[in-house]
C-alpha cells in the first residue's frame, strides 16, 4: 500500500486542520506524506515516498 494517499487521490489531510493538495500542505509547513522524516521541516513538491521514508533530496 502506498504510504502517500495523496499520490492516488490528489488531495489529503495532513493532521489537524492542515489541508493538502497535490501532495503538499496548503495550510501548514509539513508535507502531507506521513512517511516524510520528522526532522524534515518541509518536503519539496513532487517528493516521492519510498517505503516509509522520503529520499533526503526531498527535504528542503
Swiss-Prot record:
GO terms for molecular function: metal ion binding. A divalent metal cation 1 binds at residues 4, 6, 20, 23. A divalent metal cation 2 binds at residues 6, 12, 14, 25. Residues 29-60 are annotated as: Alpha. Residues 1-28 are annotated as: Beta. A divalent metal cation 6 binds at residues 36, 40, 43, 59. A divalent metal cation 4 binds at residues 32-33, 43, 47. The keyword Metal-binding applies. Pfam families: Metallothio. A divalent metal cation 3 binds at residues 14, 18, 23, 28. Keywords: Metal-binding, Metal-thiolate cluster. Transmembrane segments: none annotated. A divalent metal cation 7 binds at residues 49, 54, 58-59. InterPro entries: Metalthion_dom_sf, Metalthion_dom_sf_vert, Metalthion_vert, Metalthion_vert_metal_BS. One of its GO terms (biological process) is response to cadmium ion. A divalent metal cation 5 binds at residues 33, 35-36, 49. Metallothioneins have a high content of cysteine residues that bind various heavy metals. Belongs to the metallothionein superfamily. Type 1 family. Class I metallothioneins contain 2 metal-binding domains: four divalent ions are chelated within cluster A of the alpha domain and are coordinated via cysteinyl thiolate bridges to 11 cysteine ligands. Cluster B, the corresponding region within the beta domain, can ligate three divalent ions to 9 cysteines. This is Metallothionein B. It comes from Oncorhynchus mykiss.
